[in-house]
Amino acid sequence: AGSRVESIPADHFNHCVAVVKLSSGTYMPLDPTWVPFCRELWSSAEQQQNYLPGVPEGSDLCLTPVSAPENHYVRIKANNKLDAKGTLTGQFTITAEGQSDSNIRGMFTRGWQSQWKNMLESQLLNVSPKARLLSVDYGKDPKDYQAAPIKITFRYEIPEYAIPGKEELVFKPMVMNNLYNQVKSYLRINTDLPERQYGFKDGCSRLVELDETIQLPKGYTLLNEAKNESKQSDAADFKGSLSQDGDKITLHQKLALKKRVYEAADWDGFRSAVNAHKSFGDYKK
């Protein structure tokens, strides 16, 4: 296998994998390098790359298929409460599958158990250095990657999360404030560029769903107008909303990134969806 393999020279291959013949007669690649601690038998971090099966009937070069974004979902659901002093209290649950699961679960499968709590706390400290982890529930055995998709629930308190002003509080939604950015590989792609002449790569196709409810102190209202936005293209889709009902603000986002390897022509659709997603990051009460 290799990210790009020419038709003849064998020295373009960088490692060997295996294939299994399915009942349909098609061949499915298996990669023993990445199967341990991964919930798929072929690493989708290597989708859209060349491989050459060594089969009795012979084969030409093949291309590993695109993996649907929903195979690699990451979902964060937060329920928070903000007081007039700017202290945020609440809980969030993160769930993930596929390559997103492997990214989040890695601290359990590759890290020291004595450091689990510190590493989980660091996710909150990325949001605010004043964050306090009250409790965390990662199930009975988070190393058992074959049992189910990863699920972790945090309870926390963050003093001075919101910046108080004259009869106002300014803050960013927690689910968009450096929370588990490690799995959001698309954030490492500069979407300020208006156009690209060449193709580009992300870590993996991915589905990102972010939901947050924030209960405001009595008398506070959202200054920004309610927001609904959607984008669709062959490269990426986005749908998001922000609204207030009573004393609660509700944020919802769904970002589907459909490939790992993109052509230059995909840039406008990818960039538009990711920038729309980012635009929900700031608002003021």
For the regions a protein language model found, what residue spans apply to each?
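A sensor for short, sequence-defined functional sites
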Residues: 1-285
